[in-house]
Structures are given as C-alpha cells and as structure tokens.
Amino acid sequence: MDATTAPHRIPPEMPQYGEDYYIFEMMQNMLEQLLIHQPEDPISFMITHLRRNNDNVPKVVILGPPASGKTTIAMWLCKHLNSNLITKESLLEREFSRLSVEAKSYYQVYKKIPNSILVSLVQERLNEDDCLRKGWILDGIPERREQALMIQTLGLAPKHVIVLNAPDTVLIERNVGKRIDPVTGEIYHTTFDWPPEPEIQNRLRQPEGISEIETAKKLLEYHRHIIRILPSYPKILKTISSDQPCVDVFYQALTYVQSGHRCNAPFTPKVLLCGPLGSGKRLQATLLAQKYGLVNISCGQLLKEAVAAKSSFGELIQPFFEKRMTVPDSIITKVLADRMEQQDCIQKGWVLHGFPRDLDQARMLNSMGYNPNRVFFLSVPLDSILERLTLRRTDPVTGERFHLMYKPPPTIEVQVRLLQNPKDSEEYIKLQTDLFYRNSGDLEQYYDRAIIVNGDQDPYTVFEYIESGIINPLPRKVT
C-alpha cells in the first residue's frame, strides 16, 4: 500500500466479508494446528485442514464424582450434537486395537490403566475420522492431573470443560439406587428415574461397587484428584450443580457447549434494537453510544434532520410530514444508506432503532449490505408500556418533561398547566403496540439469531444484558 496516498480508507465490504466468513478465526485455527502438528509440508496440511471444515465441532470434557450424572449428560449431549461419546469402557472394548488389548489385560489384573496407555488410547481414538469430522465428548477423562497434562502436550485441547458437583450425601444416595440397561447403556434409578416399560425393568442390572462404603471411597479419591485437574483448564471451565433435575443440568451444559469463547478477531458492532413503542430502545441506544462510541442512528430522527437541513432528501420527505403520512420505504432506505456509509459508522459501528418495522424493510436493509451482527428484541407487556407513556406530561412554559408517577411536578401550579402529547394517548399507544407485535413474529424469524431481552426491568439491568450479548460470541447453531 502506497504510504504517500494516506489516509487509506478500507472499503466497508472487506471487513464485512471477513466477519461473515470468519476469515480471522479460520486463519487463527490454521496457525494453531500448524504449530501443534508442525508438518513437513505446511501447504498440504492446511489444504487438508480446510477440507475437513471441522473448526466448530464439539470438543468437550465432562468431569464429576460418581453418581453426579456425567455419563447421562454426556450421552444426551452426544445425541443432540451428533458427536462421539468416549469413555474409559468404550476405549477398552475397541476392536482391532493393539493398545486396547494391552490395556484390557492390564485392567483385568490391576483394576486400573497406566496413564501413558490411557492417554495413548485417547489419542488413537480422537485421531480417527469420525472424531475429526463430528467432534468428541470425553466422559470422566482425564482422571488425574498427569493425564490432563499429557493430553494437552499432544495438542488434544478441549474447547469446553464441564464439572458436575453435588453434596456427597446426595451422591451416595443416588449411587445405591443406580441401575444400568445392558442393551442401551442407559442409566436408571430405583427412586428418581425408574423406566415405565416392564421390558426394560426386567433387564436392568445393578452395577458393581455401588455400596455406601465403596462409593465413599471413590468420592474421597475423586476429591483428591479433581482439585489438581481444574487448574489445567482455567478459561474454559464451567461448574454446574447436579443436585437438580437432570433436564436442567443438561440445558445448562448444552447452553455452555454451544457458546463460543471470546476471540481476538476484529469486531465492529452493528446493533439493531427492536421493540414496541416505549420499550426503551432510544435509551439503550444512547447508553451503547456513550460507552462504546457507536453511532446512534434513530430512523425517525434522521428523517427530521433531513427536513430541517432542507437537503434533497428533506424536500422529498417534507410533504409526507405535512400530510402526516408514512414516508415510503424507498426514501427511508436512501436516507439510512447515506448515513450508514459514512466513515464514522464504518469505523466505530452503529446502533439502529426505529427501522426495520416489518419483514420487507428488513430485507431491504439486508439487500443494501447493512445487515446487523447483533439483534435484540426488547419485550415489554402492554400494561408497562401504558404506565410509561400515558403518564408523561410536558410543561409548556419551561419545556420540562414530567411523569406523574416517577417524576411528578413540584407544585400544583405546574401540574395544572401540564399538557399531554397526543402520541401519548392510550388509543394511539395500543394501536402502535398492536402494529409492532403483528410484524414482530416475521422479524424474529428473519433474524433467527436475535436475542430476546426482558425490557420490563431497570434500564441499567437491560443494558447489562444487551452489553453481554454484544461482547460475547453468539451461540453456534446445531446442524
């Protein structure tokens, strides 16, 4: 690039393309794999890596004490994510593996597997084609810190580590009633999860080593080792209480596994706030603009500014304002495009509200190349909206605004002269709210990765939810 032609302006299409196709993340992943494997032919290695297209497959480790439900959660995750479940038992039962035969023979004599053999079994399994294509979920492995370090040294790094915990008394009670289906491998319980089918009931088997004393010994051993394993995964670890319904544990685990970790990729926020009249879109946009320097784009305000500036767009808009008619979408999109193609929007990002209001407008916005990368729907019930808006008043003398409940006028004299904006009438608000919710279903379907935020709470609490949704990567879709 010629330095004499500075300052250089990067076309907005370039960062948009990089963001849409995850170019930065792809290059980062390739560099990581090159450093881990150090191939003699890097070009061929990168071509093979790209053809696999497996950067986003699940790589999960689930740990927990006996009877914490880790195997059940791992099996459910496997089914939901279409991945591969890997347990110590499945590694020992593998056919056509010399290591499995050796490990099984050792286990039958000593009831344990040496760290080096277990890690070699894990490496052999994870390098097979199905694990490379679909990912893997390790159930109860690693068992010791030494195993965790050996696995990391081989470059087999999980993306998410889940640790289940519960009080020992609960775990002992659970373990005593555990039963296993020898056909499917599903785990049941005599009290908490008894199968309704008589056929399954009749074939259930009681596993060995589940007495109270044996369970207590296993718990002691687990607690001794887990505190040394956890420091190996400081940034990808999530602890979940398993002393709750299994479905709730699974939901929390699935939500975490589908979430992405923060990346170093350049990110320019392009935020769209949707919500009914009085949902707080304007306030949230102002807060985002103040904290992160985003350009606050209010569709209605842009149209008013164009008319006030007597621009070419303003001359087109003014007749519609005078007749109190809706400005055509074609004019609105041109005004928006003129604002959003300016350098401050390209460099800093933007937060848009007031547009789109229906599916056609959303498609028009996308066709112009201004597709938001974060969409938030502020959900507020009608009663709260009416309370917020119908009680607003304005002092015609000072221009000061009041709210009869939250900011009442200081004196009776001021209260008597207060006026209400016609747009704050109950009839108008109900009409506008009904119009929004009539179109919101199509918008939510169009922006299928939108985040729904409860807007009926303190505005700074709402802001924290929106801020979290912008800073953290969006959850990945399950294909």
Curated annotation (Swiss-Prot):
Domain of life: Eukaryota
GO molecular function: (d)CMP kinase activity; adenylate kinase activity; AMP binding; ATP binding; nucleoside diphosphate kinase activity
Residues given in the record as AMP 2 binding sites: 325-327, 354-357, 361
Region (Adenylate kinase 2): 269-471
Stretch list, region NMP 1: 87-113
Reaction it catalyzes: AMP + ATP = 2 ADP; a 2'-deoxyribonucleoside 5'-diphosphate + ATP = a 2'-deoxyribonucleoside 5'-triphosphate + ADP; a ribonucleoside 5'-diphosphate + ATP = a ribonucleoside 5'-triphosphate + ADP
Binding site for ATP 2: 278-283, 392
Span list, region LID 1: 177-206
Adenylate kinase 1: region residues: 58-258
Subcellular location, principal: cytoplasm
Key words of the record: ATP-binding, Cell projection, Cytoplasm, Cytoskeleton, Kinase, Nucleotide-binding, Transferase
Enzyme Commission no: 2.7.4.3, 2.7.4.6
Compartmental location: Cytoplasm, Cytosol; Cytoplasm, Cytoskeleton, Cilium axoneme
Residues making up the signal peptide according to the UniProt record: none
GO biological process: ventricular system development
Enzyme class: transferase
CDD domains documented for this protein: ADK (cd01428), DD_AK8 (cd22979)
One cellular component term from this protein's GO annotations in UniProt: axoneme
Residues the entry annotates as binding AMP 1: 140-143, 147, 203
List of residues binding ATP 1: 67-72
Record's subunit section: Interacts with CFAP45 and CFAP52; CFAP45 and AK8 dimerization may create a cavity at the interface of the dimer that can accommodate AMP.
Family designation: Belongs to the adenylate kinase family.
HAMAP family: Adenylate_kinase_Adk
Described function: Nucleoside monophosphate (NMP) kinase that catalyzes the reversible transfer of the terminal phosphate group between nucleoside triphosphates and monophosphates. Has highest activity toward AMP, and weaker activity toward dAMP, CMP and dCMP. Also displays broad nucleoside diphosphate kinase activity.
Protein name: Adenylate kinase 8
